[in-house]
Amino acid sequence: EAFQGEVYMNLHTIDKADVENEAKIINFNSTDIELPPNKIPTLTRDFRATEKMNIFQLFSHSHEKTVEFRVEIAGGNRDGELLYISYDWEHPPVMKFDPPLVVKRGETIRLKATYDNWTDETVTFGLRSTDEMMILFGAYYAD
């Protein structure tokens, strides 16, 4: 049975002269997900910063088989530095950073997700909660 929903949004504007920084969206994701049956695999994906990122918000998106979602710096002096972690796929924390978390141009952000595929089927990327995802959303501004 079809139903119609409604969504409302309030947009607040300011004068262009009052803008200090223009926010950009973080959308780091991987569709290359293949979880073998009855296993607990950890997948990693790396994303290199193409500009200096002053990150002021991060949150993960994944589905029901996710048991841990970590975001770290990979390589260099900050190797292994934890930026974000979630153990709750349904209600991931939205982390806000003030002052912003700085990731320099050329540094690598690593997504590391651990899944528990308790089923007898291989699970892949997909839109249903019984499929899986590995996405990092957030917001930043560049210098």
Regions found by a protein language model. Give the residues of each.
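Beta-strand-centric surfaces of beta-sandwich/beta-rich domains
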Residues: 1-143
